[in-house]
Design a protein with these regions (language model features):
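Short glycine-rich anion-binding loops that position phosphate/pyrophosphate groups of nucleotides
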Residues: 83-85, 155-156, 201
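Short, hinge-like loop/turn segments at secondary-structure boundaries
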Residues: 56-60, 117-120, 145-147, 167-169, ...
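A conserved helix-loop-beta module that forms one wall/lid of the active-site cleft
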Residues: 96, 102-164
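ATP-binding N-terminal substructure of ATP-dependent carboxylate-amine bond-forming enzymes
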Residues: 1-110, 136
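CheY-like receiver
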Residues: 70-71, 118, 141-144, 175-178
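Internal nucleotide-binding/catalytic subdomain
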Residues: 162, 166-262
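Structural detector of well-ordered beta-strand residues that form the stable sheet scaffold
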Residues: 40, 79, 99-101, 127, ...
Length: 262
């Protein structure tokens, strides 16, 4: 039986498992090492920068359940550098070790419409948006947003991938096909002035806190620079922190959560 409320202290037995071997996995491993933890990386074979800085590596696919079981038995907990881990993989790992954050959180982060619904439930505002299942939905929703929107696949996609800007000259049928004719969300395009990020952590013993709020600067939809702490008045800071804690409660969340606000 896994006791998910016990703190995981740095020692030879308490190895942190990391899912994904990219740059974020590397940063997790480096941070863990500074705190005295050993790390065990699980990722498909390939060009994985995180492999250079961990104590142990298992190369396997996300559906290689034999390797996943062996990996889970070697670690005190497992976390991930990205959200798109298959649910069956997470369910298997959760049966043998403490997966942080939980499968519920991963599922919410994997589906944009669920993310938006959770944000609204927690008190955050979102741009107007519509769930798009076919071209009829797309035509109707685009008209509602005055042909000024962004169409995104409901799952996957990042750094500007898996999305298209919609305007008066857009060929909606062509764009729909380019995105694979899969379920999408259509978001109102906002003319925003600033982007602020808030990062909140909460441990299984309910110790929590915030990193300094930061301001992000992008070029062509890709992050170029972050400045911390961001210059914000205390009223806005307190409001953001309150809503972030509410989001954490709604997700029964443990770990570190980051939210981008515009």
């Amino acid at each position: 039986m896994i006791n998910k409320n016990l703190p995981i202290l740095p020692n030879e037995k308490n190895v942190i498992g990391i899912l994904g071997g990219g740059q974020l996995g590397k940063l997790i491993a480096l941070s863990a090492s500074k705190s005295g933890y050993k790390t065990h990386l699980y990722c498909p074979r390939g060009d994985n920068p995180a492999e250079m800085v961990v104590d142990k590596v298992t190369n396997g696919e996300w559906n290689d359940f034999e390797k996943l079981v062996q990996f889970s038995e070697d670690v005190a907990c497992a976390t991930s550098e990205f959200e798109n881990i298959p649910s069956k993989t997470l369910e298997l790992l959760s049966g043998n070790t403490n997966v942080i954050p939980s499968n519920i959180v991963f599922r919410c982060a994997q589906i944009r419409s669920k993310e938006k619904e959770m944000a609204l439930k927690s008190g955050f505002n979102t741009p107007k948006w519509f769930l798009i299942k076919n071209t009829d939905d797309l035509i109707t929703a685009t008209q509602s947003l005055s042909n000024n929107a962004i169409l995104k696949t409901n799952t996957f996609g990042y750094d500007g991938k898996g999305q298209f800007r919609i305007n008066n000259n857009s060929n909606l049928f062509e764009i729909w096909e380019k995105l694979g004719a899969v379920e999408c969300v259509l978001e109102e395009l906002l003319d925003f002035k600033r982007e602020i990020s808030i990062m909140y952590f909460k441990s299984t013993d309910n110790t929590d806190g915030f990193f300094p709020l930061s301001e992000n600067f992008h070029e062509n939809g890709i992050l170029k620079k972050t400045i911390a702490p961001a210059i914000l008045n205390d009223v806005i800071k307190d409001e953001l922190k309150l809503k972030t804690k509410k989001l954490s409660e709604n997700l029964n969340f443990y770990g570190i959560i980051a939210i981008e606000l515009f």
